[in-house]
Structure formats: structure tokens, C-alpha cells
């Protein structure tokens, strides 16, 4: 597991906005940024209580945080999210677009509603989050988008919708990095493999050879850990630590990249 050594407060004075930060990977990212001294805007869509719990956890690290409700699939809500963040903290230095959803369906069964739900959150929302970040970030800021190992993975059935929604984000990343360069803003994407979250609990069996619904979680973890040289499945803290590096001034020469976060897993 990730170690618990004391973390230097290398992001003191920075302000970060993390979408979907009330749980899962987003929570892990928000906490790691806060441990390093950043003030954090914890965005959530519907579950206020978990988001406020993240704010409370951040306060225990000595950093500041605020929870702001916004449905990021709606552009006016994205605009309001950024305006409220700026009113609360005065400026923004780091924006992490994390929210996402996953659907596994045979191609012939995918409906327009399925398509719109996945692409509205995984793809369209990330475009407009990045657009607003570009406008509002101070010079030298950081944008981190969320792709997935699925964007370049073959051999997984019923996966076209999710894989396609994440592949588009990788194209955004490379183009945005060019467009944002004059403000010295870097734009990167991370592409995690399996990470222990509620989405993992619901869908990870699809990635296990001969996996089936209702598999015990211990079997799923063991099956996926077998692909990883480190012998385990990722936890949100693992992802948060990489994002914390990308948010740091030392990461400036990492730009326009998609960073695969799988612990070396080969599938």
C-alpha cells in the first residue's frame, strides 16, 4: 500500500479545484493536494454529506477547503462553479477534471441515452472544464484531465462507449497543451487502471479473465493484482500522489502527456 510518511507542504499558497471530489479518485486527489498545503474546492453533483466530510478531512491537514455543488455536464453550472471558487479563494492555480461514469453494453444495445450520459460527463464536461480552467487559471497553472487505461486497451468486450469517451480526452490534452502554452499552463491527462472505488466495485469483474457478476471482491482484487508487478490493486491515494506531482512547479516540463497509472500492469 501507499506509505504514510509526512508530506512536505510544497503547494502552500496554491488553490486547486477538483471535480467529483466527494468520493473515490477525486477524494484521493483532493486530500493529497491538501496535504501539500493547497486550498481545495471540492466539487460534487448530488451527495453533499460525503463532500463536506472531505472538506472536514482537509481541515485536519491544516489546509482550507470548500464544497461547491455543480452539475458539470451543464456549461452554465461549470461557469458558476468557477465563479464561486474564485469568489471564495480569490484565484485558481490547479484544476483537476475527475468526474466520470462507465457503461458496459453490447454495441447493438447502446441507446442514445447511454451515449449521451457517458459522453456528456466523460468527454463534453472535461472539454468545458478545461476551457474554463484556461480562462481563469493564473499564469503557470496546471490542468489535469482524466483518461483511462481503457482508452488504449483491446480485448475487453462491450467497452466501446467508455473507451471512446476517454480516447477523446487524450486528444483534447495534446491540443490544449499547445493552446495554453502562452500562459505557461501545462495540460496533462492521467490514465489509471483499476482503482479501488465504488465504480471499481461495480465494474471491475469485467476486466478479470472469466469474470462474472457477483464475483467476491477478494477474487476480483486477486485476479487483477496478478497482472501487476507490485502485486496489488491501486487505491485513490496512488492517483492523488501523481496528480500532486503534476501540480507542483517541478513538473513544468511534463506537458501534453497522457500518463498511464497501472503499477506496471500488463493485461
Curated annotation (Swiss-Prot):
Signal peptide: none annotated. It comes from the Eukaryota. The active site is at 147 (proton donor), 148 (proton donor), 162 (proton acceptor), 166 (lowers pka of active site tyr). Pfam families: adh_short_C2 (PF13561). It is an enzyme of class 1 (oxidoreductase). SUPFAM superfamilies: NAD(P)-binding Rossmann-fold domains (SSF51735). Its EC number is 1.1.-.-. InterPro entries: NAD(P)-bd_dom_sf (IPR036291), Sc_DH/Rdtase_CS (IPR020904), SDR_fam (IPR002347). GO terms for molecular function: oxidoreductase activity. NADP(+) binds at residues 25, 45, 71, 98, 162, 166, 195, 197. Keywords: NADP, Oxidoreductase. Belongs to the short-chain dehydrogenases/reductases (SDR) family. PANTHER family: OXIDOREDUCTASE, SHORT-CHAIN DEHYDROGENASE/REDUCTASE FAMILY (AFU_ORTHOLOGUE AFUA_5G02870), SHORT-CHAIN DEHYDROGENASE_REDUCTASE FAMILY PROTEIN. Hydroxynaphthalene reductase-like protein; part of the Pks2 gene cluster that mediates the formation of infectious structures (appressoria), enabling these fungi to kill insects faster. The product of the Pks2 gene cluster is different from the one of Pks1 and has still not been identified. This is Hydroxynaphthalene reductase-like protein Arp2. It comes from Metarhizium robertsii (strain ARSEF 23 / ATCC MYA-3075) (Metarhizium anisopliae (strain ARSEF 23)).
Amino acid at each position: 500500500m501507499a506509505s504514510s510518511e509526512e508530506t512536505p507542504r510544497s503547494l502552500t499558497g496554491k488553490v486547486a479545484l477538483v471535480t467529483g471530489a466527494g468520493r473515490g479518485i477525486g477524494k484521493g486527489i483532493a486530500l493529497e493536494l491538501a496535504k501539500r498545503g493547497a486550498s481545495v474546492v471540492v466539487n460534487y453533483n448530488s451527495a453533499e454529506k460525503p463532500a463536506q466530510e472531505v472538506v472536514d478531512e482537509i481541515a485536519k491537514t491544516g489546509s482550507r477547503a470548500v464544497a461547491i455543488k455543480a452539475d458539470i455536464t451543464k456549461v452554465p453550472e461549470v461557469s458558476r462553479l468557477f465563479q464561486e471558487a474564485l469568489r471564495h479563494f480569490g484565484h485558481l492555480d490547479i484544476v483537476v477534471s475527475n468526474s466520470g461514469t462507465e457503461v458496459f453494453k453490447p454495441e447493438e444495445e447502446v441507446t442514445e441515452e447511454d451515449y449521451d450520459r457517458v459522453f456528456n460527463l466523460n468527454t463534453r464536461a472535461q472539454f468545458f472544464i478545461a476551457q474554463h480552467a484556461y480562462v481563469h487559471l493564473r499564469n503557470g497553472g496546471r490542468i489535469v484531465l482524466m483518461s483511462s487505461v481503457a482508452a488504449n486497451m483491446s480485448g475487453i468486450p462491450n467497452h466501446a462507449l467508455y473507451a471512446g469517451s476517454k480516447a477523446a480526452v487524450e486528444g483534447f490534452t495534446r491540443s490544449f497543451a499547445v493552446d495554453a502554452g502562452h500562459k505557461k499552463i501545462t495540460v496533462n491527462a492521467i490514465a489509471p487502471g483499476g482503482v479501488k472505488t465504488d465504480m471499481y466495485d461495480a465494474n471491475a469483474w469485467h476486466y478479470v479473465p472469466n469474470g462474472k457478476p457477483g464475483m467476491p471482491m477478494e477474487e476480483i482484487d486477486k485476479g487483477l493484482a496478478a497482472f501487476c508487478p507490485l502485486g496489488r490493486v491501486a487505491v485513490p491515494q496512488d492517483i492523488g500522489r501523481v496528480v500532486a506531482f503534476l501540480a507542483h512547479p517541478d513538473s513544468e516540463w511534463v506537458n501534453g502527456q497522457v500518463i498511464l497509472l497501472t503499477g506496471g500492469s500488463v493485461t
